[in-house]
Structures are given as C-alpha cells and as structure tokens.
Amino acid sequence: MGSAAMDTKKKKEVSSPGGSSGKKNPSLKRRSLRVHIPDLSSFAMPLLDGDVENSEKHSSRKVDSPFSSGSPSRGLFSRGPQPRPSSPVSAPVRPKTSPGSPKTVFPFSYQESPPRSPRRMSFSGIFRSSSKESSPNSNPSTSPGGIRFFSRSRKTSSVSSSPSTPTQVTKQHPFPLESYKQEPERPESRIYASSSPPDTGQRFCLAFQSPARPPLASPTYHAPLRTAVLAAAPGPAEAGMLEKLEFQEEEDSESGVYMRFMRSHKCYDIVPTSSKLVVFDTTLQVKKAFFALVANGVRAAPLWESKKQSFVGMLTITDFINILHRYYKSPMVQIYELEEHKIETWRELYLQETFKPLVNISPDASLFDAVYSLIKNKIHRLPVIDPISGNALYILTHKRILKFLQLFMSDMPKPAFMKQNLDELGIGTYHNIAFIHPDTPIIKALNIFVERRISALPVVDESGKVVDIYSKFDVINLAAEKTYNNLDITVTQALQHRSQYFEGVVKCSKLETLETIVDRIVRAEVHRLVVVNEADSIVGIISLSDILQALILTPAGAKQKETETE
C-alpha cells in the first residue's frame, strides 16, 4: 500500500508539473525563466533589433532620443520659440528627474507617461559624440557615414510643428533657434570655410562658402544672423572674413574705393595660371645669366644660393648696366669682369658698400601691401615667395597690378579725381627732366641711368620734339648682339637693332583726365607716358609708379607715412 501510493504521487508530479494540484519543481522554474530572459530583453529594446512594428506599437513611450532624426517634421533643426537640450545618452528620461539621474544599461530612453506634445532635440545635439547618431523613426545606423549624412542635410529639417513647453530644461544653449527662422544659409559654411573665393571686383557682393560643401541657395547676408554667428565662434579663420566685412560696411568716401579694393585682394589672386619664371644660381657666370635673360625674354630673375638654401636677391638689367658702367674702359677692350665673374662674386663686390636684403612678399599679403612695398623701396620687381615651401611663385610688377585693377574699374564707383586732369592733380615729373639726343653715346646714357636712377630716357631732336625713347630694357640688346665691348656708338645706332619687345613712345597731354591716362597706359602695355605740349615738345614724364601712388596710396595717406619713414 505504501509503495503504491508513492508511485501514484510521482506519476502525477511528472504528468502535470504546472498543475494546481501538484507541487512545482524549483529547478524547473528557474530553467524556464532563463529561457525567457532573451525574449524579454528584445521586447524591451525593439529598436535595437530593427522591429518597426514594435516601435509603432510603443509610440506612447516616445521621448527625446539622443539620436538625430531624418524626418523633416521632427529633424534636428526644428524651429521653435525656445530650444531644449538633449538628455544624456544612458540616462532614462522621466518627467520629474534631475539631470544627474543614475545611468542604466539600456540605451533606449524610457518614459513612464506619454508626453503631451512632440519633443525634439535642441541645437546642442550636433555637438554630441558619434555614438548618438541614429534615428528612432528609421533603420538604425551606427556608421560614421550616417553621421555625416544627417549633419549635411540639415536644411531639409526646416519645417516643424509648433512645440509645447518642454517638461525639462537643463541648459540654455548659446545659439537660440529664433535666429534661424529665416536661415539664408548654413552658418557653419561661413564659420569654418577654409578659404573664400576671389572677389569679382564688386565690393558689395562678398560671398563666403566652403568648397567642401554644396553651393548655397542664397548669397545674401542678414546682418543680425552674421553678427551672432561670428561673435559666438571667433577664431583665425574668421579674422580674414571680419576684415572683409568691415571693408564692405565701412563708410568711406569714394576716393578710397581703389584702396579698399586692393586691400581685399591677395597677391595670389594676380598670379597667372601659367607663367615663365627663370631662376639663377649664384654660381652661374654673369655673362651666361644675361644671355639667359635675353633668350627667355624676361627682365629679371630670382637668385638662389645653394649654401643658404634660399633666395638672396634678384638679377635685373640694372645689374648689367652697373657692370658696364663700372668696368668699361675703352672700345674693343674685353670686360674681364663680365666674362669671368660669377654672380656671387659680383654681388660681393657690388653689395659690399650697401647691402640690401631681398625684398619679397607672401602670396597671402594684400595687393595694397605689394604696391606700398614697390613704391617705398623704389623697385620695379617684387618676387612672390611662399613662406612655407620657400618657392618663388611669380614676380609682381607695376604693370601687372595696374592692369588687374583696371579690369574691375567698371564695376566700382568712379572717384571724382578720375575726372580731373594731370595738371590739377599734379601727377608726374615736370622738373629737371632727363633726356638725350640721337647722337648721344651709349656709355653716356648708361651713366645717366646709374646717376639719376631712372628707367628710361626720352630721345629729343634738335627742335625739342620727342622722336624716340631709350629704356633700360634696350640695353640688354647689347648682350644679345654681343656688342657691349663698344659703348661709344650712338643711341640711334643702338636703337636700329631694337628687338620686338620695344614698347614705343606713347604720349599724353597735361589736360587729359586721369581716367584717360590709365586706360591708355594699360592698353599700350608701356611703363611710362611722355607728357608733351601742343608743339610735341617734352613737358614731363608720368610713370606707373605715379599712377599707382595717386590711385591707391594717396587716398590711404601712405605718402605722408613714406616720407616719415625715409
């Protein structure tokens, strides 16, 4: 009896372990809970498994998620009367909890009661780490590509529904969303732009955008927005933009329009896409160097010293004239110094009395600085050297700068002094004019070049009329024809072998306006104009330096500054 009763009890326990009449086995209960734990965790985090239906089913538990949204109505940049910062990633959001709530292992923010209205991320969400970049309303994406996609499509989130008062405000962000209700363009493209494109010459259309981002819809600026953005994040990149903005908005007279134009452009803007640049090593013979200038049709070349691994000077036609002026003795006598000396030897002899370092300029410097350096140092060639690599990029001249300015003159307001004539402005040299006659020997002309430090001599006949002009560039023909051993020939004989680079004699009158003078000297591509009277007699000389001084430096007050410096 006893054994039969015990067998019957065991059978009941095996046949119905979960029944109400039998006792439950504790080991079976624990094993059952272990089996269902993964199901419960997946039910608690439907978004991690990509279950869209579960996400819609639990829409009553939607809260502010630290992940950005791709929806245009619930995007990252939804407008509203007051911004609301996002909650921490790992802290559950509850209606009445402090920001310092304890962390949990669940990345999904849970809210006990449904919110009264949709709640969105504030502007501060874009400054969070990449671990937050996913969307509760779309398929999850944890790759960096998805992060960049949402950060680059912020303009699509311009439409949003009007939100209600947020239940939790922990921090007021320095960028209020009210200033972006009419967002003309992305502010980041102005703040973090690597470089601004060259200006088109129109001083009231200064657009800045980054080449790494798509073109903006509107280049127009709104003053309050620009001021707020630039004031909130100042830095080295903004310094140049702030300077240009000040140039755009400053209230100056029209007389300084060309000065402001030159200050807003860099030397790199004037460098051509393709050009020829000849560089000489200081160990090269002087004679071969001048022959190379003639063969390449250039008037100057930077000098490279291998010992210092840097540029130390310039070799110009003036050096050729100085060598002939110093070492020429008599006709048909070989000039040993010209034949045998190297460039470094000539520099040691010539510069031992007055050593002058190389005057150069950076490609990032303004054209105003280039003009000021040319006129202040009384030079005609200014090499543009990259300070980082040390490479020579280009050689700036008065002619190149004035031509660049003249291209944009029609797009700028015309100052009143452009309608004044040369006599009223007093531009040019009208006293103690140096000139020569057709029968003047070449050696005498070279002496005048050196003593007066001028670049050209008008050739005047017996009646006083200007018949020709002898410039420094014509002297290089002596090297081309190898006739520099006989400098007693006349100027007329030397000019008979003039090369095709002759600029010609371009004349003007003192009664012509400055606008006419600028247009004529640029079109003729010459370095100077000979001012004559009604009888075609020489009255004065107006050079490119005089014109640039009147257009750019005089309105800036640089003339007085130069006098004080000297």
Curated annotation (Swiss-Prot):
Residues that bind AMP 1: M314, L315, T316, I317, T318, D319, V359, H380, R381
Domain CBS as annotated: residue spans: 272-332, 354-412, 427-489, 501-559
Gene Ontology MF annotations: ADP binding; AMP binding; AMP-activated protein kinase activity; ATP binding; cAMP-dependent protein kinase inhibitor activity; phosphorylase kinase regulator activity; protein kinase activator activity; protein kinase binding
Compositionally biased intervals (Low complexity): 15-25, 132-144, 156-172
Binding of ATP 2, residues: R299, R381, K399, S471, K472, F473, D474, R498, H527, R528
Annotated ADP 1 binding sites: M314, L315, T316, I317, T318, D319, V359, H380, R381
Record protein name field: 5'-AMP-activated protein kinase subunit gamma-2
PTM-bearing positions, type Phosphoserine: S65, S71, S73, S90, S138, S143, S158, S161, S162, S196
Record's keyword terms, sorted: ATP-binding, CBS domain, Fatty acid biosynthesis, Fatty acid metabolism, Glycoprotein, Lipid biosynthesis, Lipid metabolism, Nucleotide-binding, Phosphoprotein, Repeat
Post-translational modification: Phosphorylated by ULK1; leading to negatively regulate AMPK activity and suggesting the existence of a regulatory feedback loop between ULK1 and AMPK. Glycosylated; O-GlcNAcylated by OGT, promoting the AMP-activated protein kinase (AMPK) activity.
Pfam families reported in the protein's UniProt record: CBS
SUPFAM superfamilies associated with the record: CBS-domain pair (SSF54631)
Region called Disordered, residue ranges: 1-198
Positions bound to AMP 2: R299, K399, S471, K472, F473, D474, R498, H527, R528
Positions bound to ADP 2: R299, K399, S471, K472, F473, D474, R498, H527, R528
GO biological process, one term: cellular response to nutrient levels
Organism: Mus musculus (Mouse)
Residues annotated to bind AMP 3: H380, T429, A434, S455, A456, H527, S543, L544, S545, D546
Signal sequence region: none
GO CC aspect terms: cytosol; nucleoplasm; nucleotide-activated protein kinase complex
Biased composition (Basic and acidic residues): 54-64, 180-189
Gene of this entry: Prkag2
Subunit structure: AMPK is a heterotrimer of an alpha catalytic subunit (PRKAA1 or PRKAA2), a beta (PRKAB1 or PRKAB2) and a gamma non-catalytic subunits (PRKAG1, PRKAG2 or PRKAG3). Interacts with FNIP1 and FNIP2.
Binding site for ATP 1: R299, M314, L315, T316, I317, T318, D319, V359, H380, R381
Protein's job: AMP/ATP-binding subunit of AMP-activated protein kinase (AMPK), an energy sensor protein kinase that plays a key role in regulating cellular energy metabolism. In response to reduction of intracellular ATP levels, AMPK activates energy-producing pathways and inhibits energy-consuming processes: inhibits protein, carbohydrate and lipid biosynthesis, as well as cell growth and proliferation. AMPK acts via direct phosphorylation of metabolic enzymes, and by longer-term effects via phosphorylation of transcription regulators.
Residues where Phosphothreonine is found: T165
